[in-house]
Amino acid sequence: MAVRTAGLTQLLAELDTIAGVSGAEEEVAEFVKGELEGCYDAFHRDALGNHFFTKEGTNPQLNLMLSAHMDEVGFVIHHVDEKGFGYFTPVGLHDDRTLANQVLTVHTEKGPIQGLTGGKPAHIVSKEEAQKAPPISEIYLDFGTRDREETEELGVRVGDYVTFERPGQLLNGGRLFTGKAVDDRAGVAVMIEVMRRLRGNDLETSVHAVATVQEEVGIRGAGPAAFRVKPDVALAIDVTLAGGTPGIEDRQLPVKIGEGPAIKFFDWAPGLGMIGNNVPKRLTSRLVAIAEEHHIPYQREVLFNGATDGWAMSLSGEGVATGTISLPSRYTHSAIGCVCPEDLAGAVDLISAFVEEFKAPL
């Protein structure tokens, strides 16, 4: 592990371990608050659960907002049958292909409970069934119990959130970190490191680092957060889809893992209600100039079928000039999301330089 990225990788590993499905981000928030101790002058928590960490600048009229969402995609228990098996529904966008034969953790009032995602053995599935992934409606959790009463004695109840049971790790000690919640704990780690780097600096702008909630279920937290801050400029920090793997053409996903953070120019998700963000040219030009001036490797990104906190922030109040710094990621919205710590370190460099040089509205 490179010395430059060792601390960032360890921070990401700790963040990834914490459970924080959309709507249940409290443990992540407490961890973030602890990691940012000494890095902010003011703190606020709003009714939704967004956490605001403000480092005050010398110009009270200048405000810059950073956002990274704390929540991860997961599941929620919606039924326990008479035999004690639990059924669940997704919280956020999931790929049913990833769910078979997994260990999941149910986060009950009594504590975490493990269950196995069960289904028919391969020996008895039909040819038609063997050709497709079972839909989530046919997948259940096996707790090793004999009936509903025993399952409920474990603490499992309708409404309990569920996550993958999998520790994050640096893959083979190499260049990729893989975990269940790199979307967007990778962005949270970057935001924490930026605030740490800025800790002793006298800045003209106030910096509002906001750990947001419920991004994965409709980008619900960032809009109210930006409404509170009323920033001159905002930057979302989030993962993006990386190509470079078998079956994906470069023209589909040209951003590559390990080639630096991506400066987003445009994103659009028509399937999610036509949401997206056309980043103002004056902002992308400034980010590109800073990356080149500081010799920070970067990529240019246009993304279809995806969006970030940037969409909601851009539409807040009278409108906010909003960009996104993207962290290339493989296998997003699965238990094995991957990012490259070097890309994260580059994002820290780029965002820190942008903040330090931000002295007037764009």
Question: Each PLM stretch: what is its role?
Answer:
Residues 1-362:
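N-terminal hydrophobic/helix-forming segments and targeting peptides
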